Amino acid sequence: MFPVAPKPQDSNQPSDRLMTEKQQEEAEWESINVLLMMHGLKPLSLVKRTDLKDLIIFDKQSSQRMRQNLKLLVEETSRQQNMIQELIETNQQLRNELQLEHSRATNQEQRANDLEQIMESVKSKIGELEDESLNRACQQQNKIKDLQKEQRTLQVKCQHYKKKRTEQQETIASLQTEVCRLRKEEEDRIVTQNRVFAYLCKRVPHTVLDRQLLCLIDYYESKIRKIHTQRQYKEDESQSEEENDYRSLDASPTYKGLLMSLQNQLKESNSQIDALLSEKLNLQKDSETRPTQHELRLYKQQVKKLEKALKKSVKLQELISPKKAEDTEKKDEPSKYNQQQALIDQRYFQVLCSINSIIHNPRAPVIIYKQSKGGAQNFNKDLIQDCGFEHLVPIIEMWADQLTSLKDLYKSLKTLSAELVPWHNLKKQDENEGIKVEDLLFIVDTMLEEVENKEKDSNMPNFQTLQAIVSHFQKLFDVPSLNGVYPRMNEVYTRLGEMNNAVRNLQELLELDSSSSLCVLVSTVGKLCRLINEDVNEQIMQVLGPEDLQSIIYKLEEHEEFFPAFQAFTNDLLEILEIDDLDAIVPAVKKLKVLSY
């Protein structure tokens, strides 16, 4: 029976399934071919032909088994290849180890042969050494005596050099203490100098005159210190002489004369000290009474203000004199209230008149004078009719505005002075106090003086040059900020002083002239070091003898080669002969020789 023909959809489904199975099988065979090609085998080909004479057909199960078998065979071959590779590597490693063992064995045999030869040569040399040992012992005793003598001389030299070193260390310590003392004196001098200047001038020195005054103070302070030291020295001398005179009073007929001369010298020194002290006090008073530049400027401004106030007071007196006559007339009025009111009105009127006179003064500002000019023409008429003081209010308001703008002017002048004269420290203005014209005039005067000084002194560098110098100093001495310039300058100054002191001390120690250069100093120090090295080499040559260093090195190498074998041989001899001392080997061998005979 034939199966019933399926519908078109039923016929398409098995065909699609067959196609997918076929594609899957082909993909599996392709993977098998890839494995075969990786192992160097030829791939299998899937042939699509209708002629089946030259072909062998497998079913699906057999083809699947074939694929599995091929996979297993390929994996087994790869595993076997890995095992073979590992076996080859282990075999090579074992061969290398065997070669190393063979080389070690040959080295050991060679070493054993060398040791046997050494033993034979040592046995042959023992006889010679027995004969030479006695002679060498005598020679060594003589050498030991010579070396002991050389050792004594070297010890004496060593002690001498130690004494020299201790003396040099003491001198170095004394020089260090002297340097510390001088540094402390220098610091005390600077401190006292600044303290006296601050006491005299109440400020910090920053001008050329201040430096000159500091030099003058330093000069007088050094003079006073010198006189004090001389006085102390003379007092010590007088005390020592008095002691000596007390001891030898009977034998010294001129004791009273010496005492009188010393007393006279003391009086003279005391009078000199008193004169210098009085001169110092006079200078201090003179410096205290002298005004500073700032005070002079303030005095000038105060004089100008007083002149202005004097002129104003004269004008007020002229205005008040006619008013007094009016007051005398008003005294006759019967009403007391009216009299008081009149006095108050008079005072107000005087104040307004004074304000008006100030405003209409030709010395007033130009803007204010122009605005008040219309009221000034009819001033007398206004005084008679309605007093005409209505124009004062806007003028005073404008004046107040101008005064408030003084703060901005002060700030701008301050910035300008900081740019032009940054070394002048301006006082900080208190907020409670108003801005005064004197302060503005002071700032302007300082700037004008600096400009005039710059014009007079053409050699004085400008601000850019000074800034370039400061930046160059910062680059040279690694100063990051301006605040570190002065400490680094002090450090450089102290280092330079230390170097100059060291150079001066070396010149004195080496007995060189103070005008000699550093090259001469370095060359003399090099010569001195060379002489010391030559002296040390000569001493080493005296200790080692006439032989050179190369022969000594050869002897030491021969000793290092010979001594281990000889030590082993002597240890064996000591064990065989049952002896603990090397000196007993020769007598023991002689005894054995006698016993053998």
Curated annotation (Swiss-Prot):
In Swiss-Prot or TrEMBL terms, this protein is called: Centrosomal protein of 70 kDa
TPR repeats sit at 483-516
Q: Which GO terms describe its molecular function?
A: gamma-tubulin binding
> What is the superkingdom listed in this entry's lineage?
Eukaryota
**Domain free text:** The coiled-coil domains may be important for tubulin-gamma-binding and hence for centrosomal localization.
Alphabetical UniProt keywords? Coiled coil, Cytoplasm, Cytoskeleton, TPR repeat
What's a single GO BP term from this record? cilium assembly
Instruction: State its role.
Output: Plays a role in the organization of both preexisting and nascent microtubules in interphase cells. During mitosis, required for the organization and orientation of the mitotic spindle.
Q: Where is this region: Disordered?
A: 1-24
* Subunit structure as annotated in this protein's UniProt entry: Directly interacts with tubulin-gamma; this interaction determines centrosomal localization.
Query: What compartments host this protein?
Result: Cytoplasm, Cytoskeleton, Microtubule organizing center, Centrosome
Residues forming coiled coils? 66-179, 254-320
Q: Can you name the source organism?
A: Macaca fascicularis
List, alphabetically, the InterPro entries matched: CEP70 (IPR037692), TPR_rpt (IPR019734)
Mind telling me which GO cellular component terms the entry cites?
centrosome; cytoplasm
Q: Which PANTHER family does the entry link to?
A: CENTROSOMAL PROTEIN OF 70 KDA
Mainly resides where? Answer: cytoplasm
